[in-house]
Regions:
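Enzyme catalytic cores with a strong preference for nitrogen-chemistry domains
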Residues: 1-207
Length: 207
């Protein structure tokens, strides 16, 4: 239904969802555009420490890409090695990772940016603890600078909080080390920004 809703809309949209594949359950993001499911990206790093115990439910992403059946005879790509490109804008190459993937020692986005991704999208349910908002902001800025990319971070909102964890919709957009937009924690704002992908391509050629 969500894919059908995007028909006629020239916008790349990512949604989070659980996906069952070959007997295992994965925490995934689906890329939607123009009524199509362009790909499904599973989460690579599954946290199982502190307040996180995702391994009770989810398996880490398998290596490589595979075909995933959708409906009728239609299929899509399932895997982490995907870049979503705009044929009219050569600089636009979008990769996706999920929450803990960014906080890991070697995030999947390191591989994605090395393969040409200029924008990395992160669908996150990052809970709030003392000092975490500032650390999160610092982490995103450093990661986007180190990998010369734009990093778009969408966080779970207050309505998704439970008795165990609190979420604050701390959305962020960073570009090559600079913070472009921020939706403050526990607010009602949105993070929106215009990205200079041509400048990032120029920076990459210089490095």
């Amino acid at each position: 239904e969500l894919a059908a809703f995007t028909k006629g809309i020239s916008m790349l949209i990512f949604i989070g969802l659980p996906v069952a594949y070959i007997g295992k359950l994965y925490n995934c993001a689906a890329a939607l555009c123009g009524g199509k499911v362009l790909g499904i990206v599973p989460k690579t790093h599954i946290p199982n420490y502190g307040e996180f115990y995702e391994k009770r439910y989810f398996s880490p992403a398998p290596k490589g890409n595979a075909s995933y059946p959708l409906w009728a005879e239609e299929t899509t790509i399932f895997g982490t090695d995907q870049l979503f490109a705009d044929i009219n804008l050569s600089e636009t190459k979008v990769a996706c990772e999920i929450c803990e993937d960014l906080w890991a020692g070697i995030p999947p986005s390191v591989r994605h940016t090395a393969a040409g991704a200029t924008i990395v999208v992160n669908l996150s349910a990052s809970d709030e603890t003392v000092g975490k908002a500032e650390y999160r902001k610092t982490l995103l800025g450093a990661h986007s600078g180190k990998n010369v990319c734009a990093y778009v971070y969408a966080d779970a909102g207050m309505g998704e909080s439970t008795t165990d964890m609190v979420f604050a919709a701390h959305d962020l957009i960073c570009e090559n080390g600079a913070l472009l937009a921020e939706a403050k924690p526990f607010g009602t704002g949105r993070a929106e920004a215009v990205l200079d992908l041509g400048r990032m391509q120029c920076e990459r050629r210089r490095s």
